[in-house]
C-alpha cells in the first residue's frame, strides 16, 4: 500500500532524518494560450539518482539534495536540468516555509507559493530564469489520510492559479521571454526505503476537467507481489478536494515504447462523487520526457459533460527498473554540484 495524505500541512517535512530516507516537493504549471508547460522538483534526497541507489541503505539526503526543472512548449522539451546542489536550506515557521536548493528557491506563505528559478551554472549552454507564484484556489482546507507503506504521497494544492515570468537563455543571452498565466499543481512525496520496495510501477496524473475542476489519479497495477491500487480525487475551486469513491482505473491501448516498456496511452477513470457517476477518459497527447524507467506526458481529459480537451501532466514510473545495473549505468551521467 501507499500512505496518502491530503491537506495544506503536507508541505512540512515529515520523515525521520535517517539514512535511506527522502522527500521531494513537486510543482507543475501549464499556460494554455502559449502552449507552455514547466515542471519543478526540489529534492531532499534523490531516490532516482544512481549515486543514491548505490549508497543505499546508507544514503544521506544531505549529500543528494538538488532540483529538477524542465520547460516545454508545444509538446516538446525546450530545456531541462537535474542537479545536485551544494548550498541547501529548509526553514519552516508556522504556516510559512522556505526551501533553497542552489539557485532554486520556493517560499510558502499562507495559500501561496513563490518559486524563484535560476538554473545557471558554469559552462551551461542553456538556462531558465524567472519567478512563478502558485495561488491555491481551494479555500476549504479539507484533510484526508489513509493507507500505510514506505512511500507517502501528500496531495497539497492540486488546483492553483499560476502567474509570473519565464526566460530561456543561451550562452548568457536571453533567447525567449514569456509572461506566464495558467493553471498549476503541487504535491509532496516522502519515503523510508527505495521506490521499488512497495510496487513495481505506477501511473500518476493531474488534468483539468474545466476551469473549476481538476482530476488527480494514482494507479499501481497488480504485480506478482502486490495488489492493484487505484485512487483518485476531484479538486473543485468551490467545494474543495473530494475523494472518488469506488475508484476504478482501466489501462487501455498498451504499447511497447522505444525503451521496451509497455505503457497504456489511454486511461479510463470511473467512480462516484457525491453519489453521481463519474467517467473520465485521459489520453497521452505528447511524450515530454522519456527514458529507461520513466515517461512524462502532456495529457488531455474528456468527459460526457465536457467533451473538449483540457490539459494536464502525467507520468509513468517503472521503479523495478531501478534495480537493474544496466539502467543505472545508462542514467549515470557525471554528477554536477551547483
Labelled PLM ranges:
Residues 1-338:
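Structured soluble/peripheral alpha/beta segments that form catalytic or ligand/cofactor-binding pockets
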Amino acid at each position: 500500500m501507499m500512505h496518502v495524505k491530503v491537506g495544506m500541512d503536507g508541505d512540512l517535512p515529515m520523515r525521520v532524518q535517517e539514512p535511506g530516507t527522502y522527500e521531494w516537493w513537486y510543482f507543475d504549471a501549464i499556460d494554455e494560450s502559449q502552449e507552455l508547460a514547466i515542471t519543478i522538483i526540489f529534492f531532499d534526497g534523490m531516490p532516482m539518482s544512481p549515486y543514491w541507489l548505490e549508497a543505499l541503505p546508507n544514503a544521506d539526503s544531505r549529500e543528494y539534495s538538488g532540483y529538477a526543472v524542465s520547460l516545454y512548449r508545444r509538446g516538446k522539451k525546450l530545456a531541462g536540468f537535474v542537479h545536485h546542489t551544494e548550498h541547501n536550506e529548509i526553514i519552516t515557521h508556522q504556516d510559512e516555509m522556505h526551501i533553497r536548493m542552489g539557485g532554486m528557491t520556493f517560499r510558502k506563505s499562507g495559500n501561496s507559493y513563490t518559486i524563484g528559478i535560476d538554473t545557471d551554472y558554469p559552462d551551461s549552454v542553456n538556462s531558465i530564469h524567472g519567478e512563478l507564484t502558485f495561488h491555491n484556489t481551494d479555500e476549504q482546507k479539507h484533510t484526508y489520510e489513509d493507507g500505510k507503506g514506505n512511500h507517502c504521497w501528500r496531495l497539497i494544492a492540486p488546483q492553483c492559479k499560476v502567474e509570473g515570468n519565464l526566460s530561456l537563455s543561451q550562452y548568457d543571452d536571453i533567447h525567449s521571454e514569456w509572461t506566464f498565466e495558467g493553471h498549476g499543481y503541487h504535491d509532496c512525496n516522502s519515503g523510508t526505503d527505495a521506490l521499488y520496495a512497495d510496487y513495481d510501477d505506477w501511473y500518476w496524473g493531474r488534468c483539468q476537467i474545466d476551469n473549476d475542476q481538476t482530476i488527480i489519479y494514482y494507479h499501481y497495477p497488480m504485480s506478482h507481489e502486490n495488489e492493484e491500487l487505484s485512487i483518485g480525487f476531484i479538486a473543485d475551486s468551490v467545494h474543495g478536494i473530494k475523494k472518488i469513491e469506488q475508484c476504478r482505473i482501466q489501462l487501455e491501448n498498451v504499447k511497447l515504447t522505444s525503451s521496451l516498456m509497455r505503457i497504456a496511452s489511454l486511461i479510463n477513470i470511473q467512480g462516484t462523487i457525491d453519489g453521481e457517476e463519474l467517467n473520465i477518459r485521459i489520453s497521452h497527447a505528447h511524450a515530454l520526457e522519456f527514458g529507461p524507467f520513466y515517461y512524462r506526458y502532456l495529457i488531455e481529459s474528456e468527459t460526457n459533460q465536457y467533451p473538449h480537451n483540457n490539459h494536464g501532466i502525467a507520468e509513468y514510473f517503472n521503479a523495478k527498473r531501478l534495480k537493474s545495473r544496466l539502467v543505472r549505468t545508462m542514467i549515470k551521467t557525471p554528477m554536477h554540484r551547483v
